[in-house]
């Protein structure tokens, strides 16, 4: 992929000079990669879309191509820092993966963005090996959640094996030849016994999940976010995310839930009115409290924030200055 020109100036978020972020409107952000060639075809973009996410060539070119270029610059800068540090210490430089965290609410589109970044970053000559792991694989098995009385808290921080996730990212970041992670099935809504995802020394590792930016729970413990070289938070208004969640639920109810093996097969026979009511209840009881209490408070910890409008398009980008 070709390089683009230098970045143009932005404004402090909200016009507040005390904010750690600089905010760029969509048009200004899009100019930052105007000379870069979009390496994906329309058919590839369609394959990357999530349910209800109208991702298209224009959105990729104006929003995510500049982001991939910025990440490419960060990768190069981080590698250079590792080299000079190794020289200073008189040690042999060891290649370590660049780790990116992608966070945001359920239904906000973070999975689509993570998949898209994987494809875009793998097209840069210096980062051909890009791996994507979601934190779903580090959820406690349903049987354990039931034992602890946490099934209705699935997706909340306490429902994850955070130590296992931290060990996994630490091993990858340390350059381990092969690291394994549990596999999660959205059909069975559970960890699949014996199934694994294998990560083998990638150039870039993307970790996507609801609460990946959460700090450690007090004391001096290490959090997985401490291992990120870059982090992205996908932001939108609560009412828009609630609407996207409901529409996604209806799409699944008419499709995937019809599979008798689906954990949610019991919802397949609901009328549209009943399905909407059920989706609204799940949102109000589980997803919105998790967003309010655990997910959105981590937004300020991100290196970059993507702000979405009601149609899923990104309207502005906030980049941390310090």
From Swiss-Prot:
| A single MF term (Gene Ontology) | ATP binding
Query: What reaction(s) does this enzyme catalyze?
Result: (R)-pantothenate + ATP = (R)-4'-phosphopantothenate + ADP + H(+)
Q: Which GO cellular component term is one of those annotated?
A: cytoplasm
- Gene3D superfamilies reported for this sequence: P-loop containing nucleotide triphosphate hydrolases
Q: Which PANTHER family match?
A: URIDINE KINASE
Q: Which family does it belong to?
A: Belongs to the prokaryotic pantothenate kinase family.
> What is the official name of this protein in its record?
Pantothenate kinase
Please give the organism. Leifsonia xyli subsp. xyli (strain CTCB07)
